[in-house]
Amino acid sequence: MTVPTPYEDLLRKIAEEGSHKDDRTGTGTTSLFGQQIRFDLNEGFPLLTTKKVHFHSVVGELLWFLQGDSNVKWLQDNNIRIWNEWADEDGELGPVYGVQWRSWPTPDGRHIDQISGALETLRNNPDSRRNIVSAWNVSELENMALPPCHLLFQLYVADGKLSCQLYQRSADMFLGVPFNIASYALLTHMFAQQAGLEVGEFIWTGGDCHIYDNHKEQVAEQLSREARPYPTLELNKAASMFEYSFDDITVSGYDPHPLIRGKVAV
């Protein structure tokens, strides 16, 4: 059976056709602009198999976002350390993703829960072309430990199926993007389940899609591996969008190649 490899195909394209660029971290990158990958969520859950992706961290970070949290303590308590490099001495990150998703501040002092609003729109006006959630709050960027990389997603319903498109302005193709793909695919399943819909596609759209210079060997190793079938997501329905737990979210049939380590560019 031929296994689709849209992520690996883009990774190879960037490695072969990308331009060399300097970057904020001083590491250097090979980069292409304006790329897209599509995943049919009915053909398996897109957790990459050409290297192991730490699914526990994917789940934990998404649950943390959905709680509107901005402190890494809950993540650390659950053995997730992916945000440690950016936290201050008190564990704070400022008004990052979850805060904007759940509590976007308005000029008149109110706060908007974008996730609840998106779910309400799916239930009551599924054909809306305005069902967008944004983490890119220009007025608060300077207070964030790291401005959002995956900054906006749009939900779309057709024929009873929910699709999601993400826009990611800055895409670390080796370390970050495999994680982001799994996270937003999971979020799409959760929205669909809570709204009584089936899943359709997850579409990942990237702006600056780059491979860091210190990841070139790891990318070559990953691209030498043969992809295996995606696993199956098993999602127990929670009472609400905000009451999912680790126990509700598992994958079966995940048989990846071994982990490939790489240094995060901070």
Swiss-Prot record:
Q: Which domain of life is it from?
A: Bacteria
* Coiled-coil intervals, chain numbering: none
* Places the protein is found: Cytoplasm
Q: Which reaction does it catalyse?
A: dUMP + (6R)-5,10-methylene-5,6,7,8-tetrahydrofolate = 7,8-dihydrofolate + dTMP
Q: Which UniProt keywords apply?
A: Cytoplasm, Methyltransferase, Nucleotide biosynthesis, Transferase
Active-site residues from the entry:
C149
For molecular function, the Gene Ontology terms on record are: thymidylate synthase activity
Q: In which pathway does it act?
A: Pyrimidine metabolism; dTTP biosynthesis
Amino acids binding (6R)-5,10-methylene-5,6,7,8-tetrahydrofolate = H54, D172, A265
Q: Which family does it belong to?
A: Belongs to the thymidylate synthase family. Bacterial-type ThyA subfamily.
Name of protein:
Thymidylate synthase
Record gene name: thyA
